[in-house]
Amino acid sequence: MSESLRLTRNGPILEITLDRPKANAIDARTSFAMGEAFLSFRDDPHLRVAIITGAGEKFFSAGWDLKAAAEGEAPDADFGPGGFAGLTELFDLNKPVIAAVNGYAFGGGFELALAADFIICADHASFALPEAKLGIVPDSGGVLRLPKILPPAIVNDMVMTGRRMTAEEALRWGVVNRVVSPHELLDSARELARQLVQSAPLAVAALKEITRTTRDMSVEEGYRYIRSGSLRHYPAVLHSEDALEGPLAFAEKRDPEWKGH
């Protein structure tokens, strides 16, 4: 594993800390290491939730390492499994990821956060996609994911001028789930992770799959799709032991014992 990453396992929760002074920027080597970490998380049946954060309190991540770019690393370089930062194109990851944004999330750092399922940020955090000012575009998901969240006028402002969005503005627009003080950030992310662990893992996988694949469909189209047999996890939920265990545990007034099948 790369020196730029710290991995910590707390039972079913994996914490990934990006640690590349001074700005937690991501070059191809670091991106490959992050991809390996997220693939390991995906494939480990004992891990249920991941938290991605940055070291320090100033930068979550400044995105692509411009020093590496100046030394010849191309914008379309191979950034490894899962795309840039290991998560932006990891479309078959059906476990939840929480981005604990501890500071500036710029460029690919913002795109990394957008690829997570939940974003909790410190109150001093800010978000920006300044790529146009560098002669490139935010093509690691920013220009694709942000329009699904924000109105066109706000998107255009951010991607074409590089305007920064504050934590409170991000909360108001629904870009982040919650804003907390810096010293509460990791505790808040861990508490959310513990809440997610209480949900059945197969049901969570099905929910990620359904929301991802039906996002641009009408309700009627979505109904047809989830009943078409095209999904992997939704039919499995309907015939799973967990689907029996949940109601039984509720009736018996005890915590359910999820098996994931």
From Swiss-Prot:
Described function: Catalyzes the reversible dehydration of L-carnitinyl-CoA to crotonobetainyl-CoA.
Query: What's a GO biological-process term for it?
Result: fatty acid beta-oxidation
Give the reactions, separated by semicolons, that this protein catalyses.
Answer: (R)-carnitinyl-CoA = crotonobetainyl-CoA + H2O
Q: Which source organism does the UniProt entry give? A: Salmonella arizonae (strain ATCC BAA-731 / CDC346-86 / RSK2980)
Concerning HAMAP family, the annotation shows: CaiD
Q: Which domain of life is it from?
A: Bacteria
What PANTHER family does the record point to? ENOYL-COA HYDRATASE, MITOCHONDRIAL, ENOYL-COA HYDRATASE-RELATED
- In which pathway does this enzyme or protein participate? Amine and polyamine metabolism; carnitine metabolism
Q: Which UniProt keywords apply?
A: Lyase
Q: What is its EC number?
A: 4.2.1.149
The GO terms this record gives for MF are: hydro-lyase activity; L-carnitine CoA-transferase activity
* SUPFAM superfamilies per UniProt: ClpP/crotonase
Pfam families linked to this entry: ECH_1
Active-site feature positions: E111 (nucleophile), E131 (proton acceptor)
Q: Which PROSITE patterns match?
A: ENOYL_COA_HYDRATASE
The name under which this protein is listed is Carnitinyl-CoA dehydratase
Q: Fetch the InterPro entries from UniProt.
A: Carnitinyl_CoA_dehydratase, ClpP/crotonase-like_dom_sf, Enoyl-CoA_hyd/isom_CS, Enoyl-CoA_hydra/iso, Enoyl-CoA_hydra_C
KW Lyase (keyword) present: yes
Question: Family assignment?
Answer: Belongs to the enoyl-CoA hydratase/isomerase family.
